[in-house]
């Protein structure tokens, strides 16, 4: 299991980067396909923390933090917001995985493993 897309302003963990450290306006040829994949992740945890956008001149409320998975990768819902709005940078390994896999496929074992992994790392 791997975690991707943590933003320090929301998730202050060792593996997180500050919003300002993420490259914006990245060119993704398959952006819609990647966005569809991210949106189809299975929710494995949710918080009551309401988060606002960190983007300049954007006062949008993103909502509560939800952690999604495909059974191997785990990502927070707010990274989907920034990917759609600003084409925020995602790791090449993650993008290649998405484009090869096409659609998330998860079973209960994967879901339980993802939940356990998240508990240990968040």
Located regions from the model:
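Alpha-helical interaction/linker modules in multidomain eukaryotic proteins
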Residues: 1-122
């Amino acid at each position: 299991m791997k975690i991707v897309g943590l933003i320090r302003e929301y998730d202050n963990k060792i593996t997180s980067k500050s919003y300002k450290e993420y490259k914006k306006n990245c060119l993704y040829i398959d952006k819609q396909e990647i966005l569809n994949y991210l949106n189809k992740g299975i929710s494995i945890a949710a918080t009551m923390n309401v988060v606002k956008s960190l983007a300049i001149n954007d006062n949008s409320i993103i909502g509560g933090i939800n952690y999604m998975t495909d059974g191997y990768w785990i990502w927070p819902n707010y990274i989907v917001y920034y990917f759609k709005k600003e084409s925020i940078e995602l790791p090449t390994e993650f993008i290649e995985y998405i484009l090869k896999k096409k659609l998330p496929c998860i079973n209960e074992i994967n879901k339980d493993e993802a939940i356990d992994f998240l508990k240990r790392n968040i």
